[in-house]
Amino acid sequence: MYLYGKYRRFNNNHEGLKKLKALIDRQNEPVLVAYESTGWLSRILAMQLLSMGISQVCLNPSRVRNYARAIGVQAKTDKKDCEMIARFAEQTHAQANVTESPVLMRLKELQSSLNFFKRRMAHAKSSLSAQRDKFLIREIQRAITHDEKQIARIEKEMHKLIKTNQEMQERYDYYLSLQGIGPNTALALISQLPELGQMNRRQVASLVGLAPYNWDSGKMTGKRMTRMGRKGIKSLLYLSVTSLLRLHDHPITKMYERLKLKGKKTIVAMVACMRKLLIWLNAETKKWLSEKNYA
């Protein structure tokens, strides 16, 4: 930790966080704890900080690293990293994260584990098709069976968790009522995109990583490209679009066909359809939330 020019180290557990809180309480002005998103480690920290009522902000690691390079800092050590995080948060006037409920935070943790097992199972299935050794084939099949059971257990736990929260259950049921949205996508929208319905079309496309960015220089006009964003949501939107393309009269199908007739590459047409589906979902959710609050 870097605070007022001094470095300190705390364990990422309850005892370590108690010492951190004691230090923060001794300060004469409010303290905002800034940290980088590092997967499950940062989620543990977020839950601990939330339980102690400490203001926090989770930062994008690539933005912090780019800031360090911009000011000429090439070295990367724990001490230098925490200093760069603190300076970046100060220079950009970082605002505290909107407090998430413990239910949502646990749902995110379960979704992260679910994505891990799905990726591992997909990799195992891919390697199985190219495997010739009988022993390894049996071992891979056993691993796939294990992952399938783990996925089923985690999904069951996620459904149980959603049922404990009326707002989440209502949102889940609403998403399922929309064409092209299945149980997996509905779960992911709740856990990985809770902001849906609270942003405009540009904001939601940028957040998910489906907003096209210019790549121009002088007289050169480069191809527009999408980057970053929430990969889990993008993958599920891709599957949703693939499902909707089977419906010949659906607006997504018509848009895809128009783009292909114009000579657009398949991936370009798919991303455009994913963006259209996301913007539609955002607009429909915004309308549903408005009607729900008005009622």
Specify the residue positions occupied by each region the protein language model found:
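Acidic, carboxylate-rich catalytic segments that either coordinate divalent cations
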Residues: 248-295
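Acidic, metal-coordinating catalytic cores used for nucleic-acid/nucleotide bond scission
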Residues: 34-45, 225
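Long, charge-rich intrinsically disordered scaffolds of nucleic-acid metabolism proteins
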Residues: 47-50, 57-178
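Nucleic-acid-processing active sites and adjacent nucleic-acid-binding tracks
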Residues: 4-32
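Acidic beta-strand-to-loop metal/phosphate-binding motif
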Residues: 30-38, 85, 241
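Phosphate-backbone recognition surface of nucleic-acid-processing proteins
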Residues: 15, 183, 187-262, 266
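Gly/Thr-rich phosphate-binding beta-strand-loop-beta motif of the actin/hexokinase/Hsp70
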Residues: 1-3, 85, 187-188
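Short, solvent-exposed helix-loop connector elements
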Residues: 95-108, 132, 221-224, 254-271
